[in-house]
Amino acid sequence: MLSLPYLMRPSLHLPTMTEDLSNIHLSKAEFQEYGYRLVDWLAEYFDNVDQYQVLPSIEPGDIRNMLPVSAPERAETMDEIIDDLDRVVMPGVAHWQHPGWYAFFPSGASPVSALGEFVAAGLATQGMMWSTAPAATEIENTVLDWLVDLLGLPSSWRLDEGPGGGVIQMSASDSTHLSLAVARHQFELSGADANSLVAYGSSQAHSSIEKGARIAGFKHIRSVPVTQTFGIDTDAFVRIVRDDIDSGLIPAWVCSAVGTTNTTAMDPIRAIAAIASENGMWHHADAAYAGSAMICPEFRELQDGVELVDSYTFNPHKWLLTNFDCSVFWVADRSKLIETLSILPPYLRNETEGNPAAIDYRDWHVPLGRRFRALKLWFVLRSYGAENLRTFIRSHVAWAEALESRIINDSRLELAAPRTLALVCFRHTDGNDATRELADAINASGSAYVTPSVTDDVAYIRVSIGSTWTEQRHVEDLWDLIDSNAGLK
């Protein structure tokens, strides 16, 4: 507790009771004026993003050198601040929304999502509990129940129908970390030695598995070999699990990738589920990218057996027209998640405790505070409708299939992995150096950006089609760029 002398120390300046603070804020008229200007600015950006070079031509430190060393003592005008969007910010923007962005996986966005984010920022609710944010809480659990149905997931994951439930996290990495923490807690409750727990993922699994396992206190992390199509080799998985058991260790957690980052390879969920069940393991499914495609029924066979997993994550902020951050995490039994994370100090007690209709999302993730992330997702699902979202996904897959066909029929090129959904991985038949040279030529064009990668010492180029503003003509332009540089003159 603070001592009385500390509390009585004089301040350099204390506002008087008559001091008016309203003049330090934007007035209603000013807010409207600058709000309209910024909407116009963003609208122009959306309409002309293809006119920019995909990646900026700057060096590390260039943007910082344009900024003052210290924060301003006196207020600057909004005119000055908005002008600096063009002068300072835009020269250093990597244009993830460019139609020629084919690198990594897409970073979803849309005008509707931006408007939802704008409203959420203005409302500035703190959604830690139902009592502090009833609308934010109930819109979130309703929208996530909608998604259970839209993606063909088990109805028992709906908050209103079963023991499961969903929550929006910052990223799939956070979801993976949580699943590991819950698994560890369940084993500790049973009396298991936490130092003996083992986590498993394929050699192609996302790096967040290793990071999450470290944070969750797992001492043993296994990388399971994959088959020729880059999915987990279940025979190898069984052998590794048996070896660990023979060594006195406890198999505790395994991840099935519903689309690996490198090649969108699919792990055999149903077969992995059988091994996990036999050994009492927590089974997590990471569908960060591919999960959005499950809105199209024809792609759901890619995650056959999903009803058997204990937790599942996907990112609307990748391929469902919703801007970062928005990652959905479902658990088959929400009581295990809440039991792991619930801490109730006196200052968080409230009159709705124990009411099943009053969800306190503070018990569903690590932070206490949380943003109104569901609002932009609610805007997107309502504004586009499932029909248009399916058209969006199917178009990208069709364009990827057409690009794949051109690669197959070009003797200079070859596929580096089977195509799944809208990611095409290919290489130059002259080998690794030629492949890297081709990737460099594409990226140097300024009109397209692809990701070079390597698996088992084989270099290849990833083309991920999924940007909000990409159209068929842009993919055809990319092919022309590949074709004109594949000769490697």
Regions found by a protein language model. Give the residues of each.
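N-terminal entrance/gating region of PLP-dependent enzymes' catalytic architecture
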Residues: 15-163, 444, 448, 459, ...
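Short loop-beta-helix segment that forms the pyridoxal 5′-phosphate
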Residues: 147-181, 222-225
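Short Gly/Ser/Thr- and Asp/Glu-enriched loop/turn motifs at secondary-structure junctions
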Residues: 161-163, 417-422, 454-460
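Conserved PLP-enzyme active-site core in the AAT-like
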Residues: 174-336
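Active-site C-terminal subdomain of aminotransferase-like
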Residues: 304-408
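Conserved PLP-binding catalytic core of the aspartate aminotransferase-like
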Residues: 414-442
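PLP-dependent enzyme catalytic core of the Aspartate aminotransferase-like
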Residues: 455-489
